[in-house]
Amino acid sequence: MSDQSFLDWPFFNREHRELATRLDQWAGDHLSALTANEHDDLDGTCKTIVKALGGAGFTAYAVPASAGGHHAKLDVRSLCLIRETLARHNALSDFAFAMQGLGSGPISLFGSEAQQADYLNAVAMGDKIAAFALSEPDAGSDVAGMTCRARRDGDDWVL
């Protein structure tokens, strides 16, 4: 276990300290085995990590309580502790967790009730991997420069 004296800072409460300790222990016990093949099967390893994080209850921090999360609203301190702890143990694990929040955030904030019901609980459980579009040719990571658009065609969407 690393030095966790920072958890004594006044903006962390008992729940944050318990979360950091529990995740650090879990990561030490599980991540080496989960990520042993990450260079051979990157996609498969990410799926395995997300499923395991979900099974341990950690991806539920990426969605609100209404979708199976731990808090009524997302708790940024918990999210930061999770990301820092995962990154210290394995960078790919941090990336896989971060995508759960980045992809589900827009659905939490702007998704229809049907979209929220379909995706967010599955994200909380680690059963679905959230994603979002950030890049395309000639736009790089400039979201405003993207030219891809979606238009409704009957019951479908066409990109």
Task: State each model region's role.
Residues 28-56, 69-71:
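Short secondary-structure junction/hinge motifs that connect adjacent elements
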Residues 70-72, 114-159:
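Glycine-rich, Trp-frequent "lid" loop and neighboring beta-strands that shape
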Residues 55-127:
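Internal helix-loop-helix
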Residues 2-3, 42, 139-142:
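Short loop/turn motifs at secondary-structure junctions and domain boundaries
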Residues 26-33, 106, 130:
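Short alpha-helical functional segments enriched in proximate histidine and acidic residues
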Residues 1-3, 28-32, 58-65:
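Short acidic (Asp/Glu) and glycine-rich catalytic loops that position anionic groups and cofactors
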Residues 1-18:
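Intrinsic disorder at enzyme termini
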